[in-house]
Amino acid sequence: MIDGDGYRLNVGIVICNNHGQVFWAKRYGQHSWQFPQGGIDEGETPEQAMFRELYEEVGLTKKDVKIIATSRHWLRYKLPKRLVRWDSKPVCIGQKQKWFLLRLECDESRINMQRGKSPEFDGWRWVSYWYPVRQVVSFKRDVYRRAMKEFASLAMPFRERKTKGKRKKQRR
């Protein structure tokens, strides 16, 4: 769905593990990496779209994750002019995204990027929380920064919950 301003309605997905790391996926056949994301179909809620995309792109289901947070606002980015398909109607000039922070509740061996009709990703890894903001393609960087900033206080405690009650040396 494309809104009246030319933005495709979309969801972005940040998956955290219990170590405060985030799931980072390599685009199929490319050298670029990103979070899972995808369009919202007609009649679908953002949450329904998120679970559909999560399964299609990562192979995970509702029971494999827990929703920790949803972005308060829609976050938008414009596509570079060279990526706009001017001959499509309506013309899509960018993405308008609702972001979800999920915690992985299953073993990571359940991740399977081959479940969708045409795989979006061909590799993945866990990275430090802020790594994606520095590494994502430049036109998505501000949206990533805003989503990650909004979720930071909720994502970081995953690490502390595992070690609660144990003294841990501070790393510097």
From Swiss-Prot:
GO molecular function: mRNA 5'-diphosphatase activity
Cofactor: a divalent metal cation
Bilayer-spanning residue ranges: none
EC assignment: 3.6.1.-
Class in the EC hierarchy, top level: hydrolase
Keywords for this protein: Hydrolase
This protein's name: RNA pyrophosphohydrolase
Name of the gene this protein is made from: rppH
